[in-house]
């Protein structure tokens, strides 16, 4: 947009933090907002009541991707060709949505992969049905092969995808790591308003901030909290594993673990500054399917990172540098 290009974004209505459509955004299947540089179309994401119902989530992804595809045909007005289409995964279903848009509106298709599915779901045990996995793997390969460019976050992810494709597709794979706005996330004083809101004094805080899923191995945080009762451990975020972690904390009467909801993006710098040490855990074997990009935000905030991730992969290599 800064170069004068016209952009049309088709995305979801705000829902991720609460796993429900945020107040003031409900009541419509989509909303269109005109901007100085183009337009934003926000589509209903069809969220279920819980992230643990995988069949319901899959249905939501399919419905969302279908509506996104239809709205992408008219974003910016008809009949208009476009120069490029950018689709992002997850959800994986947006790969074919991008291809569908390209068929009708021309332009190159760039498929940006944040996590590799269905590998991530299969390796965490979230999906075990062989028929579902077979269908998802077909969708994955079909999406890669129909893209002009596939962008991945690390060499580890690139090698994973390359192993699934014929060599004639390998020149389409490119690595572009995630990044942060270092002017928005800056080092700050550790004694923040956020710390006071949590009811934590000047104790050392070990923090995990991000998605609280089953791939993060956050049981490590609870184990550390048991052995270091003088340190406060903060889990900031939400996800499918949060309830089970809270149940474990309550059952074991661990009183130095604090759970907090996602905070507004404007508070990210303050939240990260509240932590003295940040942990970035990932289950063994998952570094080839996912890159915890929260590391970049933590480093921008000037805080140390303790990573529990497969040795020799993207995050350990970056920290070693």
Where are these regions (language model features)?
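Membrane-proximal helix-turn-helix segments that form the acceptor-binding/catalytic region
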Residues: 73, 81, 93-96, 100-104, ...
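Nucleotide-sugar-dependent
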Residues: 216, 257, 261-273, 278-299, ...
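Acidic anion/phosphate-binding donor-loop and adjacent secondary structure
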Residues: 5, 162, 179-196, 217
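An aromatic- and histidine-rich active-site surface loop
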Residues: 57-73, 82-107, 111-114, 119
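Conserved donor-binding/catalytic core segment of Leloir-type glycosyltransferases
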Residues: 180, 200-216, 222-226, 234
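Carbohydrate-associated surface elements
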Residues: 13, 156, 176-179
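N-terminal subdomain of nucleotide-sugar transferases
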Residues: 1-36
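Nucleotide-activated donor-binding/catalytic signature segment of Leloir-type glycosyltransferases, i.e.
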Residues: 201, 228-237, 242-269
């Amino acid at each position: 947009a800064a170069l004068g290009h016209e952009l049309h974004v088709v995305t979801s209505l705000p829902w991720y933090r609460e796993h429900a459509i945020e107040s003031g955004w409900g009541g419509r299947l989509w909303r269109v907002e005109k901007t100085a540089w183009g337009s934003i179309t926000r589509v209903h994401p069809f969220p279920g009541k819980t992230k643990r119902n995988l069949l319901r989530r899959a249905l939501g992804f399919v419905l969302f991707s279908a509506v996104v595809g239809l709205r992408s045909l008219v974003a910016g007005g008809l009949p208009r060709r476009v120069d490029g289409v950018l689709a992002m995964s997850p959800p994986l279903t947006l790969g074919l949505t991008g291809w569908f848009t390209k068929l009708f509106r021309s332009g190159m298709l760039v498929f940006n992969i944040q996590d590799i599915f269905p590998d991530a779901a299969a390796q965490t045990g979230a999906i075990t049905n062989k028929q579902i996995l077979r269908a998802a793997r077909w969708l994955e390969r079909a999406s890669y092969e129909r893209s002009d460019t596939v962008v991945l976050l690390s060499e580890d992810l690139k090698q994973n995808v390359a192993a699934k494709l014929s060599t004639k597709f390998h020149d389409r794979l490119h690595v572009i790591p995630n990044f942060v706005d270092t002017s928005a996330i800056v080092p700050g004083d550790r004694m923040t308003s956020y710390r006071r809101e949590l009811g934590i004094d000047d104790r050392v805080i070990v923090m995990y901030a991000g998605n609280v899923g089953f791939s993060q191995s956050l049981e490590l945080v609870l184990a550390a909290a048991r052995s270091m009762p003088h340190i406060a451990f903060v889990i900031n975020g939400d996800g499918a594993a949060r309830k089970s972690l809270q149940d474990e904390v309550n059952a074991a009467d661990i009183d130095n673990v604090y759970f907090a909801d996602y905070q507004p993006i404007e508070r990210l710098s303050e939240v990260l500054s509240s932590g003295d040490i940040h942990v970035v855990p990932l289950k063994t074997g998952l570094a080839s399917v996912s890159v915890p990009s929260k590391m970049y935000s933590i480093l921008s905030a000037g805080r140390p990172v303790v990573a529990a991730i497969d040795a020799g992969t993207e995050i350990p290599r970056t920290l070693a540098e």
